[in-house]
C-alpha cells in the first residue's frame, strides 16, 4: 500500500 510505505517509519 502507499500509506504503508511512510507508515513504516
Curated annotation (Swiss-Prot):
GO terms for biological process: neuropeptide signaling pathway. This is Extended FMRFamide-7. It is found in: Secreted. The modification Leucine amide is found at residue 9. It comes from Namaquaphasma ookiepense. FMRFamides and FMRFamide-like peptides are neuropeptides. Keywords: Amidation, Neuropeptide, Secreted. GO terms for cellular component: extracellular region. Belongs to the FARP (FMRF amide related peptide) family.
Amino acid at each position: 500500500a502507499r500509506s504503508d510505505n511512510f507508515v513504516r517509519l
